Amino acid sequence: MDLGLSGKVAVITGASRGLGFATAQALAGEGCTVVMAARGLEALNKAADKLRSRWGRGSKVVPVACDVSTPDGVDHLMETAIVECGGIDVLVNNVGLGRGGSLEQTSDADWREAFDNTLFPAIRCSQLAVPHMRHRGGGVIVVVSSIYGREAGGRMTYNVVKAAEISLTKSLAQQLAKDQIRVVGVAPGSILFEGGSWWKRQQEDPKGIADFVGRELPFGRFGAPEEVGNVIAFLSSSRASWVSGTTVVVDGCQSKAF
């Protein structure tokens, strides 16, 4: 199926690995120019080279090393996207962090860190992308949240900021429909990739994670980043033109919520 994304400009945060890289890969495969944002320049350049080697040296891939938890980092990312690519059609907000423990164990600093690294990047990137999308007659904003934003399951700080992202998705979708800008959420379940949180836990406690898989994952395995990236590519396309304001769960039936 041709998704009609050829020539579109897509900005993806957290793009050097995992879900972000898989999303960049899926969008590049559909002919998008991809602007890949991440903090670490070395890992980011390696990820960009992987895309170029797969889709050809002529592929337009723009790596931008920046910290989107800061206003300056977001400014740098969006300015680079406009200067290098001329506009923005798709924005994929894909960063998140949550530390701390129980209510009494979680400090104000833990809460601030969760909001600064999850919710505020999505807000700030969207604020700067919307005028350019409006100028182009529309666009798509994808907010990557989590099933733990719909039901408690991870760290408390992570649950809260991911729930906030789901609410943000609905609010933005209602505001921006008049501008032909769709806003869609994606809530992945437990996804395994090298260097990711589940991979680290698997290295530390293989039996415990095997028990978790058998107990909590109906298909008997973790999801793969590509299984989420492909959904994001579809939602970013005109094939999903009537999908806005909802959060699509991609979890292999892991979550218990309707």
Which residues fall in each region the model found?
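Conserved glycine-rich cofactor-binding loop
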Residues: 9, 16-18
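Substrate-binding pocket helix/loop in short-chain dehydrogenase/reductase
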Residues: 102-103, 110-115, 213
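Residue(s) in the substrate-gating loop at a strand-loop-helix junction
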Residues: 146
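Short C-terminal tail/terminal secondary-structure segment
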Residues: 233, 244-258
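Alpha-helical segment proximal to the catalytic Tyr-Lys
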Residues: 131, 174-178, 241
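Active-site helix of classical SDR
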Residues: 126, 161, 169
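Short, small/polar-rich loop/turn modules that mediate ligand/substrate recognition or access, typified
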Residues: 92, 177, 182, 243-245
